[in-house]
């Protein structure tokens, strides 16, 4: 296979006690969209909400951020049951102790490490008589990385303990040894007295992105080999501390790779099964489909329980199930920052509770991108400030407002409403999530044996959180609003559209507390959320917002209809707009290049913003000529990679020689370029890939429909299939191709490109 290639161009809010607002209770004459029937006397599941709302702390987290007092207080208010370290894929790349390897200052320069300590098998010789900051490896050769993180494991352990929560440790299977893991157990639990109970063996070793997935003989890690390694690690670690709990395989997704083999062959060394979940697909666009992806969790947990019953039936009540990493999706786009992240997470945690998941750790505390990121916080590194994102408040609501016993309930009616009902020593807790983006929902309660009681309704909606996709920050992020309501055996309440609601009903002998009204903008200031400069061929999402931008408060009182107008080469989707929770959206469709000014007016309030619409000119830039040494290409292949000068007249081409090998799962990569060269162009302007492909004239393929896929990778979207070429069309002759990126969300991700496959 030969390839000729060019690129085608183109401050934390603390919890405030809030608000007696207008009643959410409605007259009995209001229509009912859904009915919730509750039997508070029948418990159907038990769980510790704190254990289901754990999180992850990564070594690359910035020290000034984790030392930020507002950040620390927000986590204390959250009460996560555990915090997993040292951080995702780095778990397989990081030696926790650098004593004897680090010989200089604690920076990342190669001269500060004794490279003679690397053994022939790629492992490193560490002196465990003392502790020094650890070090990170890179690549299959296990060379030292040029970045080892801002934190070290001692900092992680002590920071977690200072917050009053527990650490969960993932040990290095990818490049470490059982002895390295056992030394961590000894140091943490015997020397330092950290008291770490949960230890996970390896991270996502089913994935070819993980160091350790590729074995020394060139084959790939599988479930049988992983389980053998697990047992070796477990023996060494239990020899140090027999009371610790060990688990794995921390598989990358709900396909549950390696889980069956571990339960079948791991025996009583397995104390818990850990899995990871990012179930919403990269190309899932509709909100309803994103929420539907949560159902995959139920199927996965049922499969795990089936394997436990099959292979270790005497331990069905003993082996725990944990989800040591989860978030809405892998790619860190706006879904990880907008309000949907909160609603999705609230339902996800509820389903984990229903299915009997024992513990879970959201991914993560501090990993972010400009467009969003998995972090539960918005992080401004310039000011070293943090602000909770919407997902934080979903975690907070489950951890602080919900009970530990789920009771019997049934919900009928409007499909967009989801419910979870728990009880505790203090009372009954009812969580209702309205996933409709357009409609409120009237929900009637029928509570068996209930009498009249004063309750508190906590509501989280766009009135509490709004993410500005153009400014890429929250315009406001506030705790759930609280209002007092009276509930009896048949009460109806209205749920705002796209909202989380928790109704706390104390037992009859208890009393609620009155609250002060929430802070709100006194006078509205209109603003337009728009980009500054955009291509003239893309529709523009826009918002009118009524708020106090300095105080980050929405204006929630009524405001006259907003009148919109435009000067310049574009049209508006509408001439007027009504605000809902201080926000209204519209669309601008460009009709050419030039300056565009949008005006918004409501009574005496007005604002204007200008946009530059940029004309599009396309040209191709050649990035690889393949006439230089292969080592300079920054390329690799599953197959033999070479340079050929005899296939194309007067040109060099890249060649992947199959040599009779058959592509198969995890071994089908023709060319992988990473990192991409940035010298000639700004990736933010790139909008496709162009090149030429040819297969040998005698190449045979049993599948006439076989295709070669072209995939771009970005820090904002790690897997973007942008096109494919039918294999039969390139056998024996060169075929040019040009594949353009057209989806707005993928164009937005181009600025952070790092790989081409």
Model regions and ranges:
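N-terminal catalytic cores of secreted or lumenal carbohydrate-active enzymes
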Residues: 31-268
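Extracellular carbohydrate-recognition regions
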Residues: 51, 616-640
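Aromatic/acidic polysaccharide-binding cleft in carbohydrate-active enzymes
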Residues: 91, 323, 327-426
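Noncatalytic carbohydrate-binding groove/subsite architecture in carbohydrate-active enzymes
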Residues: 223-345, 355
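Carbohydrate-binding surface patches
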Residues: 415-453, 457-462, 499-504
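Short S/T/G/P-enriched beta-strand
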Residues: 514-554, 605-618
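Short carbohydrate-recognition loop motifs
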Residues: 643-669
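Extracellular ligand-binding interfaces
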Residues: 662-752
């Amino acid at each position: 296979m030969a390839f000729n290639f060019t690129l085608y161009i183109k401050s934390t809010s603390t919890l405030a006690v809030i608000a007696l607002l207008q009643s959410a209770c409605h007259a009995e004459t209001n229509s009912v969209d859904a009915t919730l029937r509750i039997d508070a006397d029948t418990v159907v599941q038990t769980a510790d909400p704190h254990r289901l709302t754990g999180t992850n702390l990564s070594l690359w987290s910035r020290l000034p951020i984790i030392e930020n007092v507002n950040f620390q207080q927000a986590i204390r208010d959250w009460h996560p049951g555990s915090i997993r370290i040292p951080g995702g894929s780095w778990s397989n790349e990081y030696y926790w102790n650098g004593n004897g390897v680090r010989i200089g200052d604690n920076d990342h320069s190669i001269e500060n490490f004794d490279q003679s300590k690397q053994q022939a098998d790629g492992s490193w010789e560490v002196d465990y008589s003392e502790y020094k900051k650890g070090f990170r490896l890179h690549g299959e050769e296990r060379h030292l990385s040029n970045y080892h993180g801002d934190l070290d494991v001692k900092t992680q352990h002590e920071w977690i303990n200072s917050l009053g929560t527990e650490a969960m440790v993932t040990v290095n299977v990818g490049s470490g040894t059982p002895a390295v893991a056992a030394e961590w157990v000894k140091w943490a639990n015997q020397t330092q007295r950290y008291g770490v109970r949960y230890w996970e063996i390896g991270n996502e070793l089913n994935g070819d992105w993980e160091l350790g997935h590729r074995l020394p003989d060139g084959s790939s890690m599988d479930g049988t080999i992983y389980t053998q390694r697990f047992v070796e690690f477990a023996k060494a670690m239990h020899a140090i501390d027999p009371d610790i709990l060990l688990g794995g395989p921390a598989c990358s997704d709900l396909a549950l790779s390696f889980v069956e083999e571990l339960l079948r062959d791991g025996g009583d060394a397995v104390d818990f099964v850990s899995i990871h979940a990012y179930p919403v697909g990269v190309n899932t666009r509709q909100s309803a489909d994103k929420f539907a992806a949560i159902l995959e969790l139920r199927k996965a947990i049922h499969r795990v329980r089936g394997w436990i019953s099959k292979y270790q039936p005497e331990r069905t009540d003993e082996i725990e199930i944990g989800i040591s990493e989860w978030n809405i999706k892998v790619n860190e786009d706006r879904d990880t920052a907008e309000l949907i992240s909160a609603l999705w997470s609230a339902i996800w945690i509820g389903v984990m509770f229903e299915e009997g998941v024992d513990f879970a750790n959201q991914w993560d505390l501090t990993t972010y991108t400009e467009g969003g990121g998995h972090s539960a916080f918005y992080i401004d590194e310039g000011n070293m400030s943090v602000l909770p994102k919407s997902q934080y408040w979903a975690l907070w609501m489950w951890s602080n407002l919900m009970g530990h016993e789920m009771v019997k309930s049934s919900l009928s009616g409007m499909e967009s409403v989801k419910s979870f009902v728990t009880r505790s020593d203090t009372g009954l807790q009812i969580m209702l999530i309205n996933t409709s983006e357009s409609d409120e929902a009237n929900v009637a309660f029928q509570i068996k044996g209930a009498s009249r009681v004063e309750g508190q309704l906590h509501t989280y909606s766009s009135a509490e959180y709004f993410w500005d996709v153009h400014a890429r920050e929250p315009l406001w992020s506030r705790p759930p609003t609280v209002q007092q309501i009276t509930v009896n055996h048949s009460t109806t309440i209205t749920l705002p559209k796209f909202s989380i609601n928790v109704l706390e009903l104390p037992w009859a002998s208890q009393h609620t507390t009155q609250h002060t009204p929430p802070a709100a903008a006194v006078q509205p200031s209109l603003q337009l959320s728009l980009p500054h400069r955009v291509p003239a061929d893309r529709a523009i999402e826009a918002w009118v917002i009524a708020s106090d931008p300095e105080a980050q408060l929405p204006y929630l009182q009524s405001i006259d209809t907003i009148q919109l107008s435009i000067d310049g080469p574009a049209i508006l989707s509408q001439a007027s707009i009504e605000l809902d929770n201080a926000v209204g959206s519209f669309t601008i469709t460009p009709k050419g290049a030039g300056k565009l000014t949008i005006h918004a007016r409501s009574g005496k309030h007005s604002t204007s913003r200008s946009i530059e619409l940029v004309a599009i000119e396309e040209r191709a830039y050649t990035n690889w000529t393949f006439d230089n040494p292969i080592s300079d290409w920054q390329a690799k292949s599953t197959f033999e990679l070479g340079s050929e000068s005899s296939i194309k007249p007067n040109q060099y081409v890249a060649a992947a020689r199959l040599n009779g090998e058959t592509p198969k799962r995890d071994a089908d990569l023709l060319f992988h370029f990473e990192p991409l060269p940035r010298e000639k162009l700004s990736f933010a302007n790139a909008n496709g890939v162009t090149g030429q492909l040819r297969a040998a004239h005698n190449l045979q393929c049993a599948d006439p429909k076989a295709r070669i896929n072209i995939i771009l990778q970005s820090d904002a979207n790690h897997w973007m299939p942008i096109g494919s070429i039918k294999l039969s069309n390139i056998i024996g002759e060169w075929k040019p191709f040009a594949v353009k990126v057209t989806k707005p969300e993928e164009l937005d991700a181009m600025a952070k490109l790092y790989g081409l496959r």
